[in-house]
Regions:
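Extracellular/periplasmic carbohydrate-active domains that bind, remodel
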Residues: 1-336
Length: 336
């Protein structure tokens, strides 16, 4: 709690106020308003139940940390027909941070985000990095991300706790985004210190995040710098991820698929300028029914890590496949 005192006293930063923030409320309706040049986050329900946010517009592109909508530890939330143009993340879901979040013990659950537009912003839909209470049962559909730094973004850290379960995304369109899909459980050394180092694997405890059961389907990425990147943690890898039925145009393919178990990409058409796929300690990985349009028609797959295994490429159209292994990686990849 002491870390969250921003009263401007004794050299501390002054805490900028949120624009609209109902706390511990039931049956909340926020509809048809426009917010311009806010001081911080715009719409922030906290510990609420039965929330509808409909048809709002946010313009806060030059506001540091100018999030659009932040849902924190709420239950039964519907967000629809919103247009967000933000200085930070557009649509954000949080569930408490570290020990304080575990003490409160309130998840963010049963959330639907639909028929909405995210324009300028760090992330179109962002989960985290506060995830202690767990973000679960999230359904995002029929949304457009135009010019955001990332499309779908998940971030948490080793000491944040919780994680996510049952997050579903479908019928999405992305235009001029940086990274289309990104998951990051490590963070940077600047903020996390030695916890940002992937190894050594830490002992699993109550603050170890667990991210599982992710479905992404029926989407179009018209233009992106990178299609997909995922940096997990070795102590609890990503588990059960499916990405299917998509059309992608990007510069880079998969920058990192690290510490993942049960990961499937299938029924995709991918046009990319670079042909690299990097896998580190990935197990039970399947790429199936994928039509690649790549330089020289070949895929460069770089596999590392002693735990990498059962990596299968099936029914892909690339003319030839190149696979590179580090010395510690046994050859556990199959191309059919």
């Amino acid at each position: 709690i002491e870390q969250r005192i921003y009263d401007g006293m004794e050299g501390r930063t002054f805490y900028r106020p949120k624009t609209i923030s109902p706390i511990n409320c039931t049956n909340v309706l926020i509809e048809g308003i426009t917010m311009e040049r806010s001081t911080l986050w715009n719409v922030v329900p906290i510990y609420c139940e039965n929330v509808i946010i409909r048809g709002i517009t946010v313009n806060s592109t030059k506001v540091p940390s100018g999030d659009g909508i932040d849902i924190e530890s709420c239950k039964n939330v519907l967000i629809e027909y919103c247009t967000l143009n933000c200085g930070d993340d557009c649509f954000t879901l949080k569930a408490g941070r570290a020990e304080d979040g575990l003490r409160v013990g309130k998840p963010t659950e049963n959330v639907v985000i639909r028929y909405s537009l995210a324009q300028h912003g760090h992330g179109g839909i962002t989960c985290g990095s506060e995830t202690a209470g767990v973000i679960k049962n999230l359904y995002v559909h029929d949304c457009v991300f135009d010019g955001t730094r990332t499309g779908i973004r998940f971030k948490t850290r080793r000491n944040r706790g919780g994680g996510s379960d049952n997050t579903y995304y479908e019928r999405l369109r992305m235009i001029n985004v940086g990274k289309a899909f990104t998951w990051d459980l490590l963070g940077s050394a600047y903020y996390m210190g030695e916890l940002a180092a992937r190894y050594p694997a830490r002992k699993v405890n109550r603050l170890t995040p667990d991210v599982k059961n992710i479905l992404i389907k029926d989407f179009i990425v018209e233009s992106a710098d990178q299609f997909f990147t995922a940096n997990g943690i070795p102590e609890i890898p990503f588990n059960q991820v499916v990405v299917e039925n998509g059309e992608i145009k990007c510069k880079k393919l998969i920058g990192a698929l690290n510490d993942a178990a049960g990961f499937t990409m299938r029924k995709l058409t991918i046009e990319a300028q670079h042909n690299d796929i990097h896998i580190l300690d990935g197990k039970d990985i399947l790429f199936e029914d994928i039509h690649f349009k790549l330089p020289a028609g070949e895929i460069m797959v770089n596999v590392e890590g002693e735990r990498s295994g059962n990596i299968v490429f099936k029914n892909i159209n690339a003319n030839q496949e190149k696979v590179e292994y580090k010395k510690e990686s046994p050859m556990r990849i199959e191309i059919k």
